[in-house]
Structures are given as C-alpha cells and as structure tokens.
C-alpha cells in the first residue's frame, strides 16, 4: 500500500486532516507531538517588522553566523529551507557528473535526500555501514550520517577515521548531522563535526530543538560559498522569516531538555508491559516484528506501524512519524521523549494509548477495507 508514492501523500494528508479536526475540538492541548520534529517559530515581537526580503538578511545574517558557529563550529554558516535542500545544493555544487558520492551510515538505508540528490547531479551513489571501507577512486564527495532517522549514532572514532580516509584521497566530507549535531554532542559527549575535520556539516533546526524546519550548514568558507551559490540558483536558501526563527532557536537551545528525556524514558519502561521495545537515545521504538498478534496478516511492517500510528493520532492525539512523515521517511514507530510535548503528557497515558492502539489494530487487521481507510482515509 505504501510503496506507491501517491498513497504516501494520501497517508500524510489524511493524518494532517485528523490533526486539524482534533485541533478544532480540543485545541493545541489535545495534541501530543512525539516525533521530535515538531519544530517551532520562536520569533520575538521585535522581529516581525524585520522579516522582509532585504531588511531581514541585513539584520539577521550576522546573528546567524554567530549563533550558528557556536552550535556547529566551522568558518561560515548558511541557512536553507530544509536539510534536504542543503544536501541537494552541496551535491550539485561539489560533484561532477559521472563521479561517485560515497555514503557512510551507522545503519542502512540512507535518508532518500542523499541518493535523490546524487541522481539529480548525474552522479553514481554507493552506501556502506563499514567505516573501514575506502571510497572508489572516482569519488567526488563523501557523506557521513551522524545519526540515522531512527537515531543510530556514529561513533566518534569511526567518524574521524572516515574523514581521514577521505582527506588522504583529496575528497571533501559532508556530515549529515540532522539530529546528530545534538545527539552526538549532548548525550554522547562527541565533538562537533567541523571540529573533527569535516569540511561541511548540516543539521535540522527542528530536530531535538525548538526551531523551524530548516537546514543549517557550517563548514569551510570556500565550500560554503559554492554551496550557497547553487542554493540561490535553485531557490533552496532559507527566507528571512525562517532565518530569524533559526537564530532565536539557536539562542534559546537548552541541552538539559535532551537529558531530561532519559528520565522520562526510564519511567515509561519501568512499568511497560506491552510488546518488546528498543531504546533510542531520547526515547524508544516499537518494531512491528515484536507485535506477534499482527504478524501473518498479509501486511508488511511499514503498514502495521502506520496503522498503529494512525490510531494513536485519531484516538489519543499522539503524533508519530509513520502517520505524518514525509513520503519515503522511516516508518519505525518511534517515540521521542525529548519533544516539547513530552513534558506535559502523562507517562501512564502514553502506555495505555499504546496498549489501546495494538488492541484496536488487532481487531480489524484482517479487514482490508478498514485498514485502507485507516491509513489513507
């Protein structure tokens, strides 16, 4: 059902309609976004008169450079309308048609933005989990994922090794640190990617922080300039309102909120009697393979996770990625307890909601029409 890209769009739009309906009935307090991607637009009143096409950049660019370098390191900062946009601009700027983009990940597969950008650049693409493997001789760009969509984190020694391998071959390194810029540094005590020698690093300002959905890139000034040039060419750069919100989010970032998630996770797991869960740095995931009552139904793991996610949303107001994520995003049922809403949801309420979702889906998983309506509307 979800292999069809059109159905992926229908699935997401159905979930957004459910959120809209719940907002009308219960207001924002009836929604608990546990995706870790809820973002925010923390503008101050004084910012509103400045978010114009030309005035905005004149005011906020200097602040962006200062706050961005403090968060990411590097010589220069650039802002993009999404992390995927930043990756696309970097691949277009730094690769040659026919060359190879070589991608290291803690766990396969890649976020679709990396192979997709490579295809648009008419370059070849290879990915590996082996951080000792050397890239092919025709490699023009090495990409390293600092933390996967399911929060698998690269070890600092592996990251350093890959950077050294690439630099020995004269290849620039881009670290996709979408959530890793905070996970790696705050919870694992790792250094910032640019401090480890990465030429470029990019993070999402809505992941594990309260900023807007946007991409913040740091790195060597000469490369940032090339990437920015390509971004302007294709309209990938962040606009003034987004840049202003990024600046405020960076200024307000509080690492302790991520650390508090560990306490919430421990409280949840202590009395949870449901299916087997797998811990993540800031929460937990439920894999469809652990849901024995739902196996053998003819539905694959992605569809089962999405069905559960839809019930959690429609019945309990709990937002998770399988329901609302962009087409192609991971369908792992992940609960991020570092999310802003995690601070106001009762842990017992979350447990009971999960039990209820499993029970309801078990009751009609053999009814194809009900499953289709549940997932696609």
From Swiss-Prot:
A Pfam family it matches: SelA
UniProt cross-references to SUPFAM superfamilies, sorted A to Z: PLP-dependent transferases
Recorded GO MF terms: L-seryl-tRNA(Sec) selenium transferase activity
Keyword S-adenosyl-L-methionine included in the entry's annotation: no
List of residues that carry N6-(pyridoxal phosphate)lysine: 207
Superkingdom of source: Archaea
Keywords: Pyridoxal phosphate
CC cofactor: pyridoxal 5'-phosphate
Family: Belongs to the UPF0425 family.
Name of the protein in its database record: UPF0425 pyridoxal phosphate-dependent protein MTH_1914
